[in-house]
């Protein structure tokens, strides 16, 4: 399918991420209330919340309504195993309430609305629909309902990430960043300071939604409005900084997800002076796309396998905003191998431009042999 024919897809994706992000805002407000959290641990001890399941159900249901569910392929992080456990009735009830509350406002976002509230079985079906494993052929929607759930639980940064892949190529991406400030100047007080403002229905939130379509040469940002869609968008452009000394480097917060020691040594070898911008989730890609940072580096432990839903949406947004994203060997990320980014060379490097990217790649090769990664 030609990229030019994706108007319905990008429009639907942007709208449903706005709706899903609004659900997240409301759920996060309740997290620290008595009995308002419903945070559980999955088999790998990572947290999962009402928002994770609620977003996946909403996105799945909307995509099925708009595009039909017969040949709909959705690759997503969550399944229904946790919700099906005997002690999860309260969690399932909270998910159902959140989903139906959000879908009751779907028409405000220009999206279809259920004739009647969805039952638990319908919500579980919607979540279970997202069981595709992707691959080199065909069209696959790729969803991370709440990327950075730990950040979400802590009242910090997180993202709703939706992408469309066809024949192994990412065609579009949308990032909902409910706690990432629309105005850059808010970052001067630190990323985490922008999250204390309560979102009010019908008003501009502190967050934003970013999106891009492959080949357009443009990436866009809209303010996140709880209860509707904004009427305008702002063009995104990466930073023009190409000197590592002046660059801001993004990296994951959790040491388990990245080798901070190696990235610190790498930054030092290039003369980087600024402290790293440590951010949960794909908000790191948002920071690069908007020019708030120039470099995102992630070097996970060798046993860790990167998943496509953690990168697809962010990669296309950065690239269409003028940036470059590759593995540490300078190769494009391969989204055609299924759930995982197979064949990844050491790590992932996203930069605001080709000149800076080449300098980073060169420094990686120079530093690699002396690292303990």
Swiss-Prot record:
Q: Which InterPro entries match?
A: DPNP, Inositol_monoP_metal-BS, Inositol_monoP_superfamily, Inositol_monophosphatase-like, Inositol_monophosphatase_CS
Q: Which residues bind Mg(2+) 1?
A: 77, 144, 146
Looking up Pfam families in the UniProt record yields: Inositol_P
Keywords for the protein's UniProt record, in alphabetical order:
Calcium, Hydrolase, Lithium, Magnesium, Metal-binding
GO biological process per UniProt: phosphatidylinositol phosphate biosynthetic process; sulfur compound metabolic process
Q: Where does Mg(2+) 3 bind?
A: 77
Q: Catalytic positions?
A: 52, 149
Q: Can the keyword Calcium be found in this entry's annotation? A: yes
The cofactor required is:
Mg(2+)
Which reactions are catalysed by this chain? adenosine 3',5'-bisphosphate + H2O = AMP + phosphate; 3'-phosphoadenylyl sulfate + H2O = adenosine 5'-phosphosulfate + phosphate
GO terms of molecular function: 3'(2'),5'-bisphosphate nucleotidase activity; metal ion binding
Residues bound to adenosine 3',5'-bisphosphate:
149, 281, 284, 298, 310
EC number(s) stated in the UniProt entry for this protein: 3.1.3.7
Tissue pattern of expression reads: Expressed in roots, leaves, stems, flowers and siliques.
Whether Transmembrane counts among this entry's keywords is no
What is its biological role? Phosphatase that converts adenosine 3'-phosphate 5'-phosphosulfate (PAPS) to adenosine 5'-phosphosulfate (APS) and 3'-phosphoadenosine 5'-phosphate (3'-PAP) to AMP. May regulate the flux of sulfur in the sulfur-activation pathway by converting PAPS to APS. Prevents both the toxicity of PAP on RNA processing enzymes as well as the product inhibition by PAP of sulfate conjugation.
Q: What is this protein called?
A: 3',5'-bisphosphate nucleotidase AHL
UniProt organism field: Arabidopsis thaliana
């Amino acid at each position: 399918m030609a990229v030019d024919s994706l108007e319905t897809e990008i429009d639907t994706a942007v709208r449903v991420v706005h709706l899903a992000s609004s659900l997240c805002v409301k759920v996060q407000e309740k997290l620290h209330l008595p009995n308002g959290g419903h945070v559980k641990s999955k088999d790998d001890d990572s947290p999962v919340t009402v928002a994770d399941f609620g977003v996946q159900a909403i996105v799945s249901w909307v995509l099925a309504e708009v595009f039909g569910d017969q040949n709909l392929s959705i690759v997503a992080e969550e399944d229904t195993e946790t919700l099906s456990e005997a002690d999860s009735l309260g969690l399932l009830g909270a998910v159902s309430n959140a989903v139906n509350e959000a879908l009751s406002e779907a028409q405000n976002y220009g999206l279809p609305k259920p004739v009647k509230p969805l039952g638990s079985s319908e919500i579980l079906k919607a979540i279970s629909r997202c069981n595709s494993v992707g691959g080199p052929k065909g069209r696959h929607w790729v969803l991370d309902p709440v990327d950075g759930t730990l950040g979400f639980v802590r009242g910090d940064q997180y993202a709703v990430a939706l992408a469309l892949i066809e024949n192994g190529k990412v065609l579009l991406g949308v990032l909902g960043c409910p706690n990432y400030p629309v105005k850059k100047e808010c970052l001067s007080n630190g990323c985490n300071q922008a999250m204390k403002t309560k979102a009010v229905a019908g008003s501009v939130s502190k967050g934003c939604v970013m999106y891009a379509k492959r080949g357009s040469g443009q990436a866009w940002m809209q303010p996140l409005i709880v209860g509707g869609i904004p009427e305008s968008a702002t063009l995104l452009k990466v930073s023009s900084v190409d000197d590592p000394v002046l660059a801001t480097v993004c990296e994951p917060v959790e040491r388990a997800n990245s080798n901070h020691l190696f990235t610190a040594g790498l930054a030092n070898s290039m003369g980087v002076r600024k402290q790293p911008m440590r951010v949960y989730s794909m908000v790191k890609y948002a920071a690069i796309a908007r020019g708030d940072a120039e470099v995102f580096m992630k070097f996970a432990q060798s046993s860790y396998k990167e998943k496509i839903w953690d990168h697809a949406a962010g990669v296309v947004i950065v690239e269409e905003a003028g940036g470059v994203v590759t593995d540490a060997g300078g190769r494009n990320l391969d989204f055609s191998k299924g759930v995982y980014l197979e064949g990844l060379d050491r790590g992932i490097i996203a930069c605001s431009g080709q000149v800076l990217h080449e300098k980073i790649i060169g420094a990686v090769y120079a530093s690699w042999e002396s690292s303990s990664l």
